[in-house]
Amino acid sequence: MRKKILSILFLFCFIGNQTEIQANEITIGIALGFTGPTESIVPSMASSAELAVSEANSSKIFLNGKEKVNSIKIDTKCDTSNIKSVNKTINENNIIGIIGAACPGISEGILLGSANEKNIPMISPSATTPLLSMLDEKNLFFRTTTPSNRDGEVLAKITKDKGIKRIAVSFQDTNYGKELEKNFKKTLTDSNVEITVSVPIKINKTDLSNEVSVLAAAGGDAVAIFTEIEQDGERLIKSILDSGAFEKFILSDRMINESTEKEFGKLINNSFGIISGSNTKNINSFYKIAKKNNINTSGPFIGESYDAAAVIVLALQEKYFKSNNNLSKNIMSVSNSPGTKIYPGEIAKGLKLLKKGKKIDYEGATNVEFNVNGDAFGTFLEKEVSKGKFRTRQQR
């Protein structure tokens, strides 16, 4: 009887001010755009997150073996009109940690909605707008990808290194596209590279002929496309190729995946871009594990998704054994030095050390380390199309 009472008391203490849950129902949400503009990259992201959850459950060490992690998929559609429905799902399922969202707008809606209301930490593997960190007044938002101000700077430096002197730019008319375009443009202008024109692309606009005409008239050695392959990106490249105005494309992270290869292949040889990631032994180790579990590793944010789930699981473990009601502090603790390094496939090791009261430093697939704002420092992989395939050139 005494053990039963203590168990019940723990469950209330564990959740603190968040939400009540029943025994054996530690639930985290994988809130990503399974349909909509990110639907081609999200399945692998979700599978990677589920892989981390599976590792924790298989260990039988999570929360002293008393609980399992239950993960549920929430389709955000990457559409801000869906925010109310997403927040309702989070609340109804008593979710205590969120992996996501994939897109900035819906991430903002969750952060200012259910996350803020219930004190639920969220770790996004792909939302890059710096605005999210500024809106986070309760230290609930983290990301395992890097903010877009760095994306734009790094991509601009690669462009300059390739000797490109004149560039036409097109960008999605959203926070994601605007931030990327702003920082890309500023870095290149400071380096005396000419931006011939900068054209916003309205989401799902039926006819892009005017935008393509403006880009073609301005000209340049290359054209930058900062959107998503399913959301106007494919149509934009196709229209530009048909116009004959450009042969070289500078691509944002959400344009780099198998869909782009399959659709255009050798037609965009020598085009290039970046994705968040590294070529260290950590990511290579993760890729081996992912491939054994039939996860496609060719797209962006795969390692970041695995790491987001792993960090939440490990933070929950530390919270349990330290009787700490602030999960955000545990997220910072397990992800940053000092502590025993934890690499891909070693979640069970991390859980075991935390059970013993030891400090860990989760490195994971992408060398996770959060700054005071919850942003990852991160690195990038330069990708270039050669023989119709995206090839990694170097780490930046």
Question: What residue spans do the PLM features occupy?
Answer:
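Extracytosolic ligand-binding ectodomains
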Residues: 6-10, 19-396
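Positively charged n-region of N-terminal signal peptides that target proteins for export
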Residues: 1-4
